[in-house]
Amino acid sequence: MVALLAEHTDTNQQAGLLVRPDNHDSLSVAVTATPVVTTTGTPATPPGLELEIQNGDGVGKRAGLPPRRKIETWVKSALYADAALTIRFVDEEEGRTLNRTYRGKDYATNVLTFAYAENEEDPVTGDIVLCCPVVETEAREQRKPLEAHYAHLIVHGVLHAQGYEHEEDAEAEEMEAIETETLQALGYADPYQGDRTV
């Protein structure tokens, strides 16, 4: 485990460090500075978000879909940089087609993230696709509220859009810790308690 601490010499600035894997054998480290709360009590500016929400052809007005305001809250809670994201809810057929086409796996999965930034200087852009029937089945089987499962998978997708991965054990531990902390701050239970389906 490595602990990093960032302090800014200007007390009106908050320093930040972002460490993320670039490839299998390298890491990127970014140092940032953001204004601290001003004397008027105004917080530092949160990351900007352009959010589009789409429903695939087979979804329509499906019961249980989260409202836009909740989706936006979940996305912002996991966002560390300005972003332009699309959240798309799809049926099993579209989910399976996307998973087969882009991952070579012939089944529908709960969430797919398509991140388009080629390097860390690029703005965070991506599409997060949630397959409604799979999400609903998982929530039922895991005895989780459907809303909590959607929140978890959207947070998970937003982290992927920002470069987080879970191929290696250390990456998975880091990502799961961020997801758990984020969801608990939103008032949801630990998403990994009892099950590791993501």
Curated annotation (Swiss-Prot):
Taxonomic lineage from the root: Bacteria, Pseudomonadati, Pseudomonadota, Betaproteobacteria, Burkholderiales
HAMAP family: Endoribonucl_YbeY
Encoding gene, per UniProt annotation: ybeY
EC number of the protein: 3.1.-.-
Cofactor binding note of this UniProt entry: Binds 1 zinc ion.
Compartments it resides in: Cytoplasm
Chief location of this protein within or outside the cell: cytoplasm
Species: Cupriavidus necator (strain ATCC 17699 / DSM 428 / KCTC 22496 / NCIMB 10442 / H16 / Stanier 337) (Ralstonia eutropha)
Name this protein carries in UniProt: Endoribonuclease YbeY
Binding site for Zn(2+): 156, 160, 166
Keyword Cytoplasm: yes
Similarity comment: family membership: Belongs to the endoribonuclease YbeY family.
